Amino acid sequence: MHGTRPSLADITLILEEIPEIIDLHCDEQFDSSEEENNHQLTEPAVQAYGVVTTCCKCGRAVRLVVECGPEDIRDLEQLFLKTLNLVCPHCA
């Protein structure tokens, strides 16, 4: 376009091949067993967590490693915040 206002003479249409229209919808259906397998893959896996706390008798550091899921490690944390205490091997 030239000038401050567009006019029809300024517009040039270049017509080449018309793009092919493609259907993007997927009509594929899964068996129920495949859906269950896919659901199982997305569940959280068991993971190792290092826990460091203090002995309730002498105050020494007590270290342990647990394997559990994310929800279980939160439950363990809640137990430590409430009444669960660990005792070191020296005080046991």
UniProtKB/Swiss-Prot annotation:
Coiled coil (residue ranges): none
Biological processes, Gene Ontology terms: DNA-templated transcription; symbiont-mediated perturbation of host cell cycle G1/S transition checkpoint; symbiont-mediated suppression of host innate immune response; symbiont-mediated suppression of host type I interferon-mediated signaling pathway
ZnF (unnamed) ranges: 55-91
Annotated segments matching region E7 terminal domain: 1-43
Motif (Nuclear export signal): 73-81
PTM info: Highly phosphorylated.
Motif stretch (LXCXE motif): 24-28
Primary localization class, coarse: host cell
Listed InterPro entries: Papilloma_E7
Gene Ontology molecular function: any one: DNA-binding transcription factor activity
One cellular-component annotation, GO: host cell cytoplasm
Compartments in which it is found: Host cytoplasm; Host nucleus
Function: Plays a role in viral genome replication by driving entry of quiescent cells into the cell cycle. Stimulation of progression from G1 to S phase allows the virus to efficiently use the cellular DNA replicating machinery to achieve viral genome replication. E7 protein has both transforming and trans-activating activities. Induces the disassembly of the E2F1 transcription factor from RB1, with subsequent transcriptional activation of E2F1-regulated S-phase genes. Interferes with host histone deacetylation mediated by HDAC1 and HDAC2, leading to transcription activation.
Free-text note on domains in this protein's UniProt record: The E7 terminal domain is an intrinsically disordered domain, whose flexibility and conformational transitions confer target adaptability to the oncoprotein. It allows adaptation to a variety of protein targets and exposes the PEST degradation sequence that regulates its turnover in the cell.
Subunit composition and interactions: Homodimer. Homooligomer. Interacts with host RB1; this interaction induces dissociation of RB1-E2F1 complex thereby disrupting RB1 activity. Interacts with host EP300; this interaction represses EP300 transcriptional activity. Interacts with protein E2; this interaction inhibits E7 oncogenic activity. Interacts with host TMEM173/STING; this interaction impairs the ability of TMEM173/STING to sense cytosolic DNA and promote the production of type I interferon (IFN-alpha and IFN-beta).
Protein's UniProt name: Protein E7
